[in-house]
Amino acid sequence: MPPSDPIIVLGAGVIGLTTAVRLLEAHLGANVHILADHWPSDALDAQYASTIAGAHHLSFADDGDARQRRWDMRTFDVLYDEWKAVGERTGLMALTQTEMWEGATSHLAVYEGNPDFRVLDPRTAPCSNITHMVSFTSLTIAPTVYLAALEARVRDLGAKLHRAHVPSLGALRTDPALLALYTRPPAAVFVCAGLGARHLVPAPEAAALFPTRGQVVVVRAPWMRAGFTRQVGSLGGGEGGTRTYIIPRCNGEVVLGGTMEQGDWTPYPRDETVTDILTRALQICPDIAPPYARSWPKDDQVAALRSIVVRDAVGFRPSRAGGARVALASAAGMRVVYNYGHGGAGWQSCWGCAEDAVALWAGGAGGARL
């Protein structure tokens, strides 16, 4: 393909921007255009999950899922190296992560690859009924900071950025308004559009895409510098069961969650869910309460925690039956690389799947699964 042929990346979430970075790094001077409805500096929108996500590196990869484990481990390595190089400047924060389970007596093997991995005595857990507990060093990400840094990187690498709605892949080659952005029909496109991919794929594939609604509460608690998660029930190779999580960020905000509601398109927070999340967060980490309230009765602690709420928000995880799709195909007269359907795993797998997507486009080895 001549360098002057446009290459389109659809989507400007963490999947689209990391894919664009790797594409531009591997092919300097490529004529890359990123088209998206939503951008990192926009107001929060449930359809743009990247800025609402908890955004910590915590793999859900089943022991038998080599592809997901590889993506997640590669992404951790990239993020950890970045944190060691620039610290918290791009929104990364290293911390001790404690994982607790009710009912289970083992952990995902992928955690053993993290620094400082330890199996802990569950009897020392801050809440009752814990049957297994581990800790390790991990990372959290302040999404708007990290996404802004990615946007700056793709600009510096020469990408052109456009706010544009793309109704179909064919429109990229036929719609005059779109063609005016990049002057000639594109020869290749990367579909990194999350749930927006429903409009860019045939009907049978579109039917496999669905939202998994997640509601979170963000509090201002700069004293928190450690992460905690409690899992009740099986992950089921993904995000099954009920999870309660506490995710501190380098800016002093802490994300409390959460919910996993498949097929629920409700974009606004439910107040009863806010109360439930605050109550569960106090169960797994009493120190999330403001210091002055820690000796108070539990209901009063919930009220105190509510007083430091910065916002509550809802995001739609871009889920896909059968898992993420990272594959090369042809459509509308173009080579198409699909990189979507990552559900709640986009942040922890972004660099790994971006590298696979670019390798597929370049004709190298990749993990295509149609």
Curated annotation (Swiss-Prot):
Induction profile: Induced when grown on D-aspartate as sole nitrogen or carbon source. Not induced when grown on L-aspartate, D-glutamate or D-alanine as sole nitrogen source, or poor nitrogen sources such as L-proline or gamma-aminobutyrate (GABA).
Subcellular locations according to the entry: Peroxisome matrix
Temperature-related behavior of activity: Optimum temperature is 37 degrees Celsius.
Predominant localisation class: other
Cofactor list: FAD
Class of this enzyme: oxidoreductase
Binding site for FAD: 15, 49-50, 54, 166, 317, 346, 348
Motif Microbody targeting signal per UniProt: ranges: 368-370
Entry-linked Gene3D superfamilies: D-Amino Acid Oxidase, subunit A, domain 2 (3.30.9.10), NAD(P)-binding Rossmann-like Domain (3.40.50.720)
Keywords: FAD, Flavoprotein, Oxidoreductase, Peroxisome
Result of altering residue 56 to A/N: Alters substrate specificity; capable of oxidizing D-methionine, D-phenylalanine and D-leucine. Markedly inhibited by anthranilate
Disruption phenotype: Unable to utilize D-aspartate as a source of nitrogen.
GO biological process, one term: cellular detoxification
Description of activity control: Inhibited by malonate and D-malate. Very mildly inhibited by benzoate, ethylenediaminetetraacetic acid (EDTA), crotonate and anthranilate. May be very mildly inhibited by meso-tartrate.
Reactions accelerated catalytically: D-aspartate + O2 + H2O = oxaloacetate + H2O2 + NH4(+); D-glutamate + O2 + H2O = H2O2 + 2-oxoglutarate + NH4(+)
pH dependence per the UniProt record: Optimum pH is 7.5.
Molecular functions (GO terms): D-aspartate oxidase activity; D-glutamate oxidase activity; FAD binding
Tagged with keyword DNA-binding: no
Annotated InterPro entries: DAO, FAD-dep_OxRdtase
One GO CC term on file: peroxisome
UniProt similarity note: Belongs to the DAMOX/DASOX family.
Quaternary structure annotation from Swiss-Prot or TrEMBL: Homotetramer.
The protein's name in its UniProt record: D-aspartate oxidase
Organism: Vanrija humicola
Name of the encoding gene: DDO
